[in-house]
């Protein structure tokens, strides 16, 4: 009788544990190791509408702290409106509803929410009521929507807001006080909006504590019209896609605390000497410009007055880069990007003086082979990006050449398989990007799957969903992480050359057949050679016999003739004269009797 209550309690505990860890089939959930409760959920299978979203939200435990609903490009898109069932997640700290087709935000009530990301939707208006239910909100991302007008006081309730992104909308008009009262705001992104310069100056006047400002694609050319001197604390500014033809040195001089600058996607074709004097720049982005079209990329003393640690020269017109051209930055540079610059090799000149380099980006080039030996600076690298090249194999000695690597991007190359040595090297690296390669899942799948399982928490960052099988046909298009292994592994040498077990056996069989055929031909040649040699030596012995050793042939049988064709025409009498006389025949028996013998 006492056992029954114990069993009931056990069943109740199991039921509660199942409820706490319940995860819908559309999602992937992370469970707390201490409380065994679901703390976060990522729902990325797509195809959600209003009714499916309601069912999904009811199936999630109410105590989750992080929820993301988004979908990769290859899956069906989501399309739903804001659902008030989200209000049941009172402990929610982070909410991401990305690319879900939402037209508005309704009136949510999430008192503990700190991050809200509703980017890539169809939100075309916003009011104070939309944000009144987020008193603890610190990060708000409204980028890539259809906002055109922001009314007065729209963000008045977000007193704790530190980061706001309005990038990639259609904002053409902004009230002068929409940012007033946001004393904690440190990051503001206004990229690719057609806001008049006068309105921009009014906006930034209300947030003088701003440290990061995004103005990419805002058509603020000339930059002198923008009152940057109103932001004395500014440390990072994005001026990309503003049709700039030169570095705005004079305007940047008004920002003494500036450490990060992006001039990407402009029309700059050269960097003048002392172009960044007056700033303490450590990070500079010059990608997607016209550097290299006019010969020399950089002029001497171009980076004087800086302490650069990160330099991006990607997607210019640089075919040969010499690290000595960056002047004083050689001593401090830790990260260099030469992506998209028509490079074909790992040129030693590009890194030979960069002794502090730890991160190198060579993506989107035309590199197809690894060298036998890397330049010595490569051994100290911790990050190496080789994505979108033409690499088709990894050498077995890569571990001895890149011994300190922590992040390795090999995505979007032509890799089909990994040898045992290269797979062991991959296992020593914390983050490896392998998506977008035509993987052959006939062999070596278990080792690659085990590598991914060990880094399952980083599956979205490392794009494991896009790391898919290309062959065999039965597994084509399946994610490697969930594919069923096919045991077709090479045993001897095939893994080194990307051969399957059947391919390796065919090569071995062909080699055996060729070796057998060559052996038969060799034996036949030896046999016929020995036979001809034996016949020749026999005739020579017969001709070299002396008269004493030669026995007479029987009567009526002609002996062996060793004479040449020329001697056969000579006189027979001459031959007889040269031959010794034959011994006389023995006496007859009758004559012996006559003499009384």
Question: Language model features by range: what are they?
Answer:
Residues 7-597:
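Extracellular leucine-rich repeat
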